[in-house]
A protein has these predicted regions:
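Short beta-strand-centered segment that lines the nucleotide-binding/catalytic pocket of NTP-utilizing
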Residues: 336-354
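Conserved nucleotide-sensing/catalytic segment adjacent to the nucleotide-binding pocket
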Residues: 355-397
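Conserved lysine of the Walker
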Residues: 323
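Hydrophobic anchor at the beta1->P-loop junction of P-loop NTPases
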Residues: 313-315
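Auxiliary tRNA-acceptor-end handling modules of aminoacyl-tRNA synthetases
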Residues: 73-94, 115-294, 299, 303-307
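Ubiquitin-like/PB1-type beta-grasp interaction modules and other compact soluble beta-rich domains
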Residues: 16-100, 104-123, 133-135, 144-148
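Conserved NTP phosphate-binding and transfer environment spanning the P-loop NTPase/kinase superfamily
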Residues: 307, 430-575
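Hydrophobic positions on the alpha1 helix immediately C-terminal to the Walker A/P-loop
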Residues: 326, 330
Length: 575
């Protein structure tokens, strides 16, 4: 076995492929059956997924016995293969990683001396920034990039994955000028590393990829100062490239997050680990918490400056953004300025189950805005702002209906804080004049990369938060949380993201220390997922992100930190 593994390292093949070759030589294979497109065929020898599905380039990858597999994956036992296209959610990470490889290769070919970095969150696209001093992207660069990408796609060059030792990978990356990729290898726990080769260009995108460049044909490139936007098909857009939507309010927050990360040296995982090693746990935690304190101070000042008009403070954001902790900390910030807000829960305005609209599957759509009593909420808010005494509802989740709640009368100088996924939806507060509303959108906006070509996914960050929180407070397994995540995401695209540009302020709830803290909580939950489980590839992807972070103990995380909302120990748990 040791000799076999040595052979694997020497010739760049993974262990499964070695076994396939050995079995081929020894003639040890039994016949097996593969079901594809409702047709079952018998095979005498191992085949790749590509051999089965054919050369239809709309097929990006496939489920093999419910597991997402690349098209070059070898099948050697009874299996069911279901093709995945750009319309499918599980094909998106593989296509997006392949597209980043294509862009990096094209830029290397036409501008070999330029250093580039990819990041996310501009109109659901890839943002490419030029890192070289005094070099900025422009229209000519966009044209050159498009032409080279088209040439590579038409050439249909194979992308071949190799497994090499970490030492060999470090030599390759150093030779190719990728010092950032070499540095991150020091934090990789495995003794080997993966590298993809395409016509002599070598890189790795921390994901499996398509078999050849001909599969990466759908994209759109545009100039977007100070870099370049690469748009690509999205499953929520039915496999099409969604229209570009500029988001200046949201963009300012992203730019600010990037500036902070760059200024503190925390724009890469290596930078974060080095900062922890240099400053120590307590100083680094305090540094990260101070970023939230500054934002809260800014918000408090803005609301204080407009206190004569502002009566309703609306807080919304996607799942696991830290809305509960944020709302409580904002309340304390305002109290320190002599402003005494009162909180009202939008959850108390749910309709009964038989009144809730249904989704396309005929199930109650509890995330729809029409699942709330919009008219009653508007009337109650308008009456409270007018100084009237109001009988508020209280939703009894055991009874599944509203019951009478507290009676409330709000002084004219006392703002109301409402928090919920629909808090920024104009329908919920249509009876309140715009000048009396202050809207806040909250979401984690990490501008951190594994290396220059591999940004951390903000969606995966929120999924990690939710996995840890659901296990901590609801006893849910990682499988439970991952299984319901697509439904959560669907609701976010439908109801939440369209409201973010209407916000007066976007609060970045990401704490640079959080992944170093949550690692110890999340890793055991993810590692418990069996390799044969359909959600294993997602767990594997999250582990790939977490494993590079140095651990930090929970001890010094403040009780009012947003991180505490997920790992436990928050002073606001009963608030």
């Amino acid at each position: 076995m040791r000799a076999c593994k040595l052979l694997m390292l020497l010739i760049g093949l993974d262990f499964a492929t070695i076994l396939v070759r050995v079995c081929e030589i020894g003639g040890q294979y039994m016949s097996f059956q593969i079901t594809f497109n409702n047709e079952t065929k018998t095979y005498e020898n191992p085949v790749t997924v590509l051999d089965v599905v054919g050369k239809d380039k709309s097929i990006i990858c496939a489920y093999v016995n419910k597991r997402v597999r690349e098209l070059t994956y070898t099948v050697d036992k009874d299996s069911e293969i279901i093709p995945l296209t750009l319309k499918d959610r599980d094909a998106k990470p593989l296509y997006e990683a392949s597209l980043r490889f294509l862009v990096a290769m094209a830029m290397h070919n036409i501008y070999p001396d330029l250093k580039i970095r990819f990041s996310y969150n501009v109109s659901r696209s890839i943002f490419m920034q030029i890192l070289n001093p005094h070099v900025c992207s422009n229209g000519m660069m966009v044209r050159d990039l498009q032409e080279e990408m088209k040439r590579l796609v038409e050439a249909d060059l194979p992308l071949v994955r190799h497994i090499v030792s970490k030492e060999e990978a470090a030599k390759i990356f150093q030779k190719d000028g990728y010092e950032d990729k070499k540095e991150i290898l020091a934090y990789r726990p495995e003794k080997t590393a993966h590298i993809y080769d395409c016509n002599g260009y070598r890189n790795y995108m921390y994901n499996r990829m398509v078999p050849s460049t001909g599969y990466i044909a759908k994209w759109r490139v545009r100039y977007y100062h100070p870099g370049i936007i690469i748009q690509y098909p999205r499953p929520e857009a039915n496999g099409e490239i969604p229209p570009f939507e500029d988001a200046p309010t949201f963009g300012k927050t992203l730019k600010r997050a990037h500036q902070w990360a760059k200024a503190t040296g925390c724009d890469t995982i290596v930078g974060i680990n080095k900062r922890i090693e240099k400053d120590g746990d307590i100083d680094f935690i305090t540094l990260c918490e101070q970023k939230h304190n500054r934002q809260l101070c800014e918000l408090g000042q803005m609301i204080e400056d407009g206190r004569e008009d502002i009566r309703l403070i609306c807080i919304a954001g996607p799942s696991s953004s830290g809305k509960t902790t944020f709302a409580n900390r904002l309340r304390i910030e305002l109290l320190s300025r002599g402003i005494e807000p009162i909180r009202i829960s939008m959850d108390d305005y749910y309709l009964t189950k038989d009144e809730v609209p249904v989704d396309e599957d005929g199930k109650p759509d509890l995330e729809a805005v029409d699942a709330l009593d919009i008219e009653l909420f508007n009337n109650n808010m308008a009456d409270l702002i007018a100084g009237l005494e109001v009988q508020l509802p209280k939703f009894d989740f055991k009874l599944g209906k509203r019951v009478p709640g507290r009676v409330l009368q709000v002084p004219i100088d006392q703002p109301i804080i409402i928090e919920g996924i629909h808090a920024l939806n104009e329908r919920m507060t249509s009876s309140i004049p715009s000048h009396q509303k202050f809207k806040i959108f909250i979401a984690p906006q990490a501008q951190v990369n594994i290396d220059d070509h591999n940004p951390l996914s903000l969606t995966d960050l929120r999924l990690l938060r939710r996995i840890v929180r659901d296990y901590q407070f609801r006893g849910a397994s990682a499988l439970d949380t991952i299984g319901m995540w697509p439904s959560v995401r669907k609701g976010e695209f439908k109801w939440i993201y369209g409201t973010q540009e209407g916000a007066n302020y976007v609060f970045n709830s990401f704490s640079t220390v959080e992944l170093s803290v949550m690692k110890k909580h999340a890793m055991p939950l993810l590692e418990a997922i069996d390799m044969d489980n359909e959600y294993f590839p997602i767990a594997e992807r999250l582990i790939r992100m977490l494993k590079f972070f140095d651990d930090i103990p929970d001890t010094w995380i403040p009780c009012n930190s947003i991180i505490r909302e997920f790992i436990g120990g928050s002073c606001y748990e009963d608030a």
